[in-house]
Swiss-Prot record:
In the N-terminal section; belongs to the precorrin-2 dehydrogenase / sirohydrochlorin ferrochelatase family. In the C-terminal section; belongs to the precorrin methyltransferase family. Then it catalyzes the NAD-dependent ring dehydrogenation of precorrin-2 to yield sirohydrochlorin. Finally, it catalyzes the ferrochelation of sirohydrochlorin to yield siroheme. Gene3D superfamilies: Cobalt-precorrin-4 Transmethylase, Domain 1, Methyltransferase, Cobalt-precorrin-4 Transmethylase, Domain 2, NAD(P)-binding Rossmann-like Domain, Sirohaem synthase, dimerisation domain, Siroheme synthase, domain 2. InterPro entries: 4pyrrol_Mease, 4pyrrol_Methylase_sf, 4pyrrole_Mease_sub1, 4pyrrole_Mease_sub2, CobA/CysG_C, NAD(P)-bd_dom_sf, Siro_Cobalamin_biosynth, Sirohaem_synt_dimer_dom_sf. This is Siroheme synthase. The lineage of its organism: Bacteria, Pseudomonadati, Pseudomonadota, Gammaproteobacteria, Pseudomonadales. NAD(+) binds at E22, V23, P43, Q44. It catalyses: uroporphyrinogen III + 2 S-adenosyl-L-methionine = precorrin-2 + 2 S-adenosyl-L-homocysteine + H(+); precorrin-2 + NAD(+) = sirohydrochlorin + NADH + 2 H(+); siroheme + 2 H(+) = sirohydrochlorin + Fe(2+). GO terms for biological process: cobalamin biosynthetic process; methylation; siroheme biosynthetic process.
Length: 465
């Protein structure tokens, strides 16, 4: 190990930055974020760097560096494009025993800056020892996606209760087990879900009860998006990997289901038109029953759970029974499939609004507000509209929409099996029969469809027409 990782307390302490350009500004921002007072020396100083120093009550020395600029400093940064000057700053710092960093010159450094993931008070540092800084930044980028932004709040919660827990659990091993359970349990999940006050209340109750605790279940209502696993949110993926039970729909792609925790129980509750594997009211009750057993229940739905996903009905039942839940939105099919098909839903020249419409109603009909749907300057997106497509096209034309209005069918959008067929209201039902189009298929109607010829970028199954 060429460098020993340490964390340096700079709160209220003086740091010298030699240099006044963009590079010096970047280093100065890091120092200021750590609470350091800045002394900047350079003949010319970047305007933003000047403001940064002034805001922090630091010192601006608009002149050349001098050997006497170091007194009182606990850290020195050389950030100029003058190599002899940088070497001089390094020699002077080393002679005085002051840690020094010279930008892009590891051999002249006694300390180096890592790539930083900041979830203060939790901080993660990644370093290549100056040998491969780009690689360190790439690793940091991965960590940024893996570590939730609310981990800082979680660490802060632990800090506030640390001494009380130590009093209740004087044994080190017992404390370690306590914190491990807390960081992986419902209290941590409340923080990560954006409910820190609730988490603190639960922890208070837990400690007041002498650490006796009964596990409380929770339901995660998660949108799985339109099919491409890369479109999942970070939060969705995290919850998928910690749930005890998964209730999933027919529209959840197998590749997404595979990302769930391996040992989680999986229950298929999918539906298709006139064929419900599990009735909706039974799904609602099942969520309540499983969560009441203390289980973490993942309700995984294709697209977004609040857009034609009946998510509102499910959480209404949970709320009525006092079951904790959180909702994770997903990319809805209209947005995802249209984007992968190269069809912008709005466009300044073609559509100033977009309307999402269900293709069949609760009683199986397509009794829709047709007059509203033929208003100019709008794009229509029909979910579950394949069976009722002949009626949809007929009624739109009957109520004033041109039979030559561009329209598209997007089957299994955003996946490798995606197929897109474009036509008009007049021939769209015929395309379904000719190409044996099947569900899940999204229907888009509007002038924006004609832009697909120019904007299509995703290949999919390459059977488009």
């Amino acid at each position: 190990m060429d460098f020993l990782p340490l964390f340096h307390s700079l709160q209220g302490r003086l740091a010298l930055v030699v240099g006044g350009g963009e590079v010096a500004l970047r280093k100065a921002r890091l120092l200021a974020d750590a609470g350091a007072r800045l002394r900047v020396v350079a003949p010319q100083i970047h305007i933003e760097l000047r403001h940064l120093v002034e805001q922090g009550g630091g010192e601006l020395l608009e002149r050349d560096y001098q050997d006497g600029d170091q007194p009182g400093c606990v850290l020195i940064i050389a950030a100029t494009d003058d190599e002899p000057l940088n070497a001089e700053v390094s020699r002077a710092a080393n002679a005085r025993g002051i840690p020094v960093n010279v930008v892009d010159a590891p051999a002249l450094c006694s300390v180096i800056f890592p790539a930083i993931v900041d979830r203060s008070p939790l901080v993660v540092a990644v370093s290549s020892g100056g040998d491969a800084p780009v690689l360190a930044r790439l690793i940091r980028a991965k960590l940024e996606t893996w570590i939730p932004s609310t981990y800082g709040q979680l660490a802060g919660l632990a800090s506030r209760f640390r001494h009380r827990v130590k009093e209740l659990l004087p044994d080190l091993q017992q404390r370690r087990v306590f914190w491990e359970n807390l960081f992986q349990g419902e209290i941590a999940e409340r923080v990560l879900a954006g409910r820190p006050a609730e988490a603190e209340r639960l922890l208070e109750e837990h400690l007041a009860g002498g650490l006796a605790h009964i596990a409380t279940g929770e339901v995660y209502l998660v949108g799985a998006g339109p099919g491409d696993p890369d479109l999942l949110t970070f939060r969705a993926l995290r919850l998928m990997q910690q749930a005890d039970v998964v209730l999933y729909d027919r529209l959840v792609a197998p590749s997404i289901l595979e990302l769930c925790r391996r040992d989680a129980e999986r229950l298929y509750v999918g539906k298709r038109r006139a064929e419900h594997a599990v009735p909706q009211d039974r799904i609602n009750r099942l969520l309540v029953e499983l969560a009441s057993q203390g289980k973490r229940v993942l309700r995984l739905k294709g697209g977004d759970p609040f857009i034609f996903g009946r998510g509102g009905e499910e959480i209404d039942e949970l709320a009525a029974h006092g079951i904790p839940f959180q909702v994770v939105p997903g990319i809805t099919a209209a947005s995802g499939c249209a984007a992968y098909a190269g069809i912008p839903l709005t466009h300044r020249d073609h559509a100033q609004s977009v309307r999402f419409v269900t293709g069949h109603l609760k009683d199986g009909t397509t009794d829709l507000p047709w007059q509203d749907l033929v208003a100019p300057g709008q794009t229509l997106v029909f979910y579950m509209g394949l069976v009722g497509l002949p009626v949809i096209c007929e009624q739109l034309v009957a109520h004033g929409r041109s039979a030559q209005t561009p329209a598209a069918l997007i089957q299994q959008g955003t996946t490798a099996q995606q197929r897109v067929f474009t036509g008009t209201l007049e021939n769209l039902p015929q395309l379904v029969a000719e190409h044996e189009v099947h569900a899940p298929t999204l229907v888009i109607v509007g002038e924006v469809v004609q832009l697909r010829d120019k904007l299509a970028w995703f290949e999919g199954a390459r059977e488009d027409a």
